């Protein structure tokens, strides 16, 4: 600029560019350009948005803090109220205690009187007992009452001592039977599982043993009473007999064991608390008595002395219960692991299924740790199985760990097939209506074109960075490489054409292709790299252009090498507008210029160009963008104008149906889907989609895609004849004649429907989104489908199982518009979506 100033000061009348020099040495004025102003506005808008987001985050944090403090204050108030209530209760209790202490003296006198009355009652009772005992001495039949009075007291004393000794023996016997010993015999080994049949089989024998024991006890008591009666004085026989009847009554009151088959209550409690054991029949009898197998056990028992049963009982475990169930010494090594079989825990044996009695049970830990389900009882509280539970829980933990490992591997495998957010493409100021892969760039860094309501067409390159790696700005946002301007309104549709990539050029196309855009201004504009304004404009529609599609063929393949529409290498472009017409254009192909290649230092060892060898995906650096527009002329010819006879509905989407471009399908706002012939422009098929039309736009078709890959669910992966592909994926013929393939449509009523292109019948429909379906895109192999909806979500579908494999909420809703467009890259690596929030997001597996 200094040089410009010199020219201005010394050469009057010579002005350089836009510099306003006045010769006074003032600095030149700043030169403003539209692109610079727009860039400044975008930068300021993004800064404002960042500040607003930061303020929103801080606002939410402050709200959370305020809510936390309010909650703490409420808790403090509640605690204070509770403490006040507690203090009032304590004060009330103190008052009651003081009142009770004051009235304590009066109550003490009343208690003394009550104690005096009780003592008097006790004295009266003792006097009555003495009166009952005195008449017995008069029944001795002696002639002299004085002698009887003198001799009576020592005889009564001796009889009382003998009775006391007998009662002490009885009490010791019952105490031994009813009270658990302080130091029981330690258990020897873990008891096996009990079988109720063992108890029921030995019930009869146990009852026989119990009756034998009762009879022996009765005979022993009778012998003892006879000996005591013979040793007593003849003058006191009547008194001894009367006193003998009285302790027998006391014995019946304490425990009626000699009279009935029911055990004493204390003994029943002991038996209920004792551990249970399942063993062989001989072992049961050996644990009770050593001579348990002798049939005449009761006879031999009667011939033993009185002390023999006591000594035998002292050596033996607790006796058999009256109900036939046997307590035995547990075999567990720990008392905490003992069985706890309570009578209430056993169900009625008659109501339970009969297990097999002849079963052999081993004490091996490998078999005891995992018992058969048929041998398990239904009683709870199995303390002795705690070690079994531990081993079982250990096995469960091992199985759980193995299951977690298998789930982890499956989860890792599933995560490898899930798409995740990678980059955000920023730059648009309004809704982004459409997004496409332009075909430019490199395999590692493909180029994306976007357009929206701000009237701009932007080019982006997906950076070839590792997952989660951030750029120099510290975020995952990617700025636009170039911006095209020329539409006077919103840009509603995009389409691209680029030459096929070549292996010799590292996967790059031979030159850059065209970008076609349809706008609200009813024009179709053609864009090329490095040129801000459009290369050409196609006029012919009278309303907004909503759909564009480049057919995978050329003019010569459809109309022949010699035709009236132009050279055979021209591209066929199909457009649909709100005026209800569909037009087929033949446009010039871009020049086949080789894009600039990287230098020798950027090549690999074998001379092969790496996929990520260019920073921006092609030879053109991202900043600044050079002007590489060609000077080749652009020509176009209108081939067909297709208009429906009885409908003014607007076309909403266009897709090629056949891989060779001979047919294409068009969807309309009135839910119609029609297949047209490219050569003649005539309608050759109609889908049965009008059956769901209700006369409003609520059932319109928003998106349509087509594939010739067989979607038969019974068809295996190896049963297809994969062919080279156009944009629809390529594949085998489904119908065998006529129109081939399957047409998939996304509707405003939230449904996705499948139509057979040959018959036109709907073969499958599914409710796909909570909101209307806005866009569809097929994977390159034709086996997966991604759908976008205004519910702000993307859903991935398996066309073989017709099931959703992944769902993600990726955009924010803006004026009722969620995700507006979605596209799947030709290599299947990337999925790109655009939404009403002005964002373009890139996903990868």
From Swiss-Prot:
Keywords: Calmodulin-binding, Coiled coil, Membrane, Repeat, WD repeat. One of its GO terms (cellular component) is membrane. One of its GO terms (molecular function) is calmodulin binding. Residues 104-125 have a biased composition (Basic and acidic residues). GO terms for biological process: cell differentiation; sporocarp development involved in sexual reproduction. Pfam families: Striatin (PF08232), WD40 (PF00400). It is a peripheral membrane protein. Its main location: membrane. The keyword Membrane applies. Signal peptide: none annotated. Residues 46-85 form a coiled coil. Residues 97-159, 238-406, 589-632, 710-737 are annotated as: Disordered. Gene3D superfamilies: 1.20.5.300, YVTN repeat-like/Quinoprotein amine dehydrogenase. Residues 238-254, 610-626 have a biased composition (Low complexity). It is found in: Membrane. InterPro entries: G-protein_beta_WD-40_rep, Striatin_N, WD40/YVTN_repeat-like_dom_sf, WD40_repeat_dom_sf, WD40_rpt, WD_repeat_striatin. Residues 724-733 have a biased composition (Gly residues). The keyword Transcription regulation does not apply. Binds calmodulin in a calcium dependent manner. May function as scaffolding or signaling protein. Required for the formation of mature fruiting bodies during early sexual development. This is Striatin Pro11. It comes from Sordaria macrospora (strain ATCC MYA-333 / DSM 997 / K(L3346) / K-hell).
